[in-house]
């Protein structure tokens, strides 16, 4: 394409340019694929506009973007149903020890795995806090500059604690031995201090 000056990474179907106010979409001949990508990109348009309006309403004119894993995860979450393909990606990442925690998302930045993990995180957020957690996050966007702080203000839980709970839920879901029992850290408490025992 000559719409943008650089090459699109593999797996990028469409993109939203907020500053230019446009969305670019492919037309591969598959109407279901086109509709899914259109929904995904319209979620970006909606969320970028919502964040800008919330900030503007509170006199803040600097745009505070969300982390990419969240924006792409939310766009996937709101544009399609969870699939067995998503299960396959997460299971493979977990089994091969490549599953990234939220704090490690920069290692998989922009990859399909990041989109899938982000979608999984959004599903877990909705299950844990209720579907309206996303609206509450956006309405609180003006209250802090960092996503972690907005998350804490909205949910009452640190992003690190949430991350640990999300990773634990994936292990329970995909690792049969843990599903039958539990991790040692969840069943027992530490009885010793530092050093060798």
Role assignments for model-derived ranges:
Residues 59-77, 172-179:
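Amphipathic, soluble alpha/beta structural segments
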Residues 42-46, 74, 91-95:
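Preference for long, solvent-exposed alpha-helical segments and helix-linker "stalks"
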Residues 69-70, 74-85, 94-156:
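Active-site-proximal alpha-helical
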Residues 109-112, 136-139, 143-197:
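Beta/coil-rich, acidic/histidine-enriched accessory regions frequently appended to metallopeptidases
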Residues 1-61, 65-67, 85:
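Juxtacatalytic substrate-recognition/specificity segment
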Residues 62-67, 95-100, 186-191:
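Amphipathic alpha-helical surface "interface" segments used
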Residues 24-41, 101-107, 180-190:
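Short secondary-structure transition/capping segments
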């Amino acid at each position: 394409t000559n719409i943008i000056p650089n090459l699109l990474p593999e797996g990028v179907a469409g993109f939203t340019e907020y500053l230019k106010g446009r969305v670019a979409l492919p037309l591969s001949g598959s109407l279901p694929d086109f509709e899914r990508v259109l929904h995904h990109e319209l979620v970006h348009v909606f969320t970028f506009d919502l964040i800008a309006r919330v900030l503007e309403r509170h006199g803040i004119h600097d745009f505070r973007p969300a982390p990419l894993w969240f924006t792409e995860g939310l766009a996937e979450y709101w544009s399609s149903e969870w699939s067995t393909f998503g299960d396959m990606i997460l299971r493979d990442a977990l089994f091969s020890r490549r599953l990234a925690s939220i704090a490690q998302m920069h290692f998989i930045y922009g990859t399909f795995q990041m989109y899938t993990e982000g979608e999984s995180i959004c599903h877990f957020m909705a299950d844990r806090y209720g579907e309206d957690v996303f609206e509450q996050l956006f309405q609180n966007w003006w209250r802090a500059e960092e996503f972690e702080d907005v998350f804490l203000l909205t949910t009452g839980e640190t992003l690190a604690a949430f991350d640990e709970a999300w990773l634990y839920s994936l292990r329970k879901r995909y690792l049969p031995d843990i599903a039958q029992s539990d991790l040692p850290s969840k069943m027992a408490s530490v009885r010793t201090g530092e050093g060798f025992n």
